A protein has these predicted regions:
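Acidic, glycine-rich active-site loops and adjacent beta-strand->loop/helix elements
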Residues: 9-11, 77-82, 109-114, 137-142, ...
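Catalytic phosphate/nucleotide-handling subdomain of diverse soluble enzymes
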Residues: 287-337
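A conserved active-site cap/scaffold subdomain adjacent to cofactor or substrate pockets
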Residues: 199-220, 225-248, 270-275
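Flexible, glycine-rich active-site loops centered on histidine and acidic residues
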Residues: 126-159
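Conserved catalytic cysteine-centered active-site region
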Residues: 32-36, 40-50, 80-132, 249-281
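Condensing-enzyme catalytic core mediating Claisen C-C bond formation in acyl metabolism
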Residues: 1-48, 147-203, 207, 316-392
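Conserved beta-ketoacyl condensing-enzyme motif
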Residues: 5, 51-112, 221-247
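Short, well-ordered amphipathic alpha-helical segments that serve as non-catalytic structural scaffolds
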Residues: 29, 51-66, 88, 204-220, ...
Length: 392
């Protein structure tokens, strides 16, 4: 029995901030962002959009009524939690009308959380091969106006339906993880934005990659020559490119080195238009690779490197299933290009707006007509979500 990704989906906001505009407003050389980060645009989420609405929007298009009857576990991986007690997965479970006899919970470890969620889902399917697990990696990366991290913000969610006999990717039982207690990036409960030691975090990312990759090769007797592509956690694509350069085997035939680099370019196309989505960034890269590479084929082995500050890293691999390409979109880049670009003033107002509650903890919201799901109101401190009905 194989276990892996049977379906995969993605959702992001309808608003973008062009990094050339941000560079002009902040007095920064545009090439510092376009070449220094390899980013072009950032997804900007309004107040009515959060990890619940994005997660539900990513999942709804890929799920059938039969899927919703077979799903008995919903996991949301996030570091953008909207409640200290109630899991976002519970809200999503209700919005998607999934059958009631299911576990729903949240996983947190910075940007690593979704990789941990896949590990948990895989173990569950091993014991219950007829069930399905919905894994959502949903986050809003928000650093603040005129901060060093401002050009690496973003918003979005990846949905993955995990099952036996999957139709896209089959996991290999080869995971190698590493934990190191470091303070490269953190967000205390009292802060709405994170604290970042940027250079130190870059060093931790690259060293975690190098040491985990060395251990992975030693344990499994595999090398870079055994892989058609390598996907990385993508806080910004330039960091992942540094990672690829660090592990590149110069003894490989030039043709294979070129294939790995070409597939890396395919894997960053979506992130360049979305920005950082924390837990979902690795899997947005995977989706971008699968939908944009012109050289992958069934049976190819893909390596994946997950990293979450603090820090936990993990390397694992999966093989493409025959017919995988039939379950992917070929129009996503065009759809991303159709979103509304914001002025700097509108970006600052929309992205950093906070709910203004009255004395009883109430607030109502509007302007969410273009969303699939929305935070419509807060009533007595309770978040109320709706599925947005589209007018014909």
């Amino acid at each position: 029995m194989t276990i892996g990704i049977d379906k995969i989906g993605f959702a992001t906001s309808n608003y973008i901030l062009k990094l050339n505009d941000l560079a002009a407003a902040r007095g920064t050389d545009p090439e510092k962002l376009s070449k220094g980060l390899l980013l072009k645009e950032l997804s900007i989420a309004p107040l009515t959009e959060d990890i619940v609405t994005l997660g539900a929007a990513a999942a709804e298009p890929i799920l059938t009524a039969e899927d919703k009857e077979k799903i008995d576990m919903v996991i949301v991986a996030t570091e953008s939690g909207i409640d200290q007690s109630k899991a976002a997965a519970v809200f999503v479970h209700g919005l998607l009308d999934i059958q009631p006899f299911a576990r729903s919970f949240e996983i947190k470890e910075a940007c690593y959380g979704a990789t941990a969620a896949l590990d948990y889902a895989k173990l569950h399917i091993e014991k219950h091969p007829d069930s399905k697990v919905l894994v959502l990696a949903s986050d809003i990366a928000k650093y603040g106006i005129n901060t060093p991290g401002e050009p690496t913000q973003g918003a979005g969610a990846i949905s993955m339906l995990i099952s036996s006999n999957p139709r896209i990717l089959a996991f290999n039982d080869d995971n190698v993880a590493q934990t190191r207690d470091v303070m490269d990036f953190w967000r205390p409960n009292y802060s709405t934005t994170p604290y970042v030691n940027g250079l130190y975090s870059t060093q931790q990312y690259l060293d975690s990659l190098k040491t985990t990759w060395t251990e992975y090769q030693k344990r499994h007797k595999l090398a870079l020559k055994d892989f058609a592509a390598y996907c990385f956690h993508l806080p910004y694509p330039k960091l992942a490119l540094k990672g690829l350069n660090k592990i590149m085997d110069k003894s490989l035939p030039q043709e294979q080195q070129d294939q790995l680099r070409k597939n890396f370019e395919a894997s960053i196309l979506y992130s360049q238009k979305v920005g950082n989505i924390y837990t979902g960034s690795l899997f947005l890269g995977l989706l971008s690779l699968l939908e944009n590479s012109d050289n992958l084929k069934a049976g190819d082995r893909i390596a994946l490197f997950g990293y979450g500050s603090g820090a936990v890293s993990e390397i694992f691999s999966a093989n493409l299933v025959p017919g995988y390409e039939e379950h992917l979109s070929r129009t996503r880049l065009e759809e991303l290009d159709q979103r509304q670009a914001l002025s700097i003033a509108d970006y600052e107002r929309i992205f950093f707006e906070e709910a203004e509650l009255d004395a009883e903890g109430n607030a109502s919201f509007s302007g969410y007509e273009d969303q699939s799901f929305a935070l419509a109101e807060i009533a007595e401190h309770q978040r109320k979500y709706i599925k947005v009905e589209k007018s014909s």
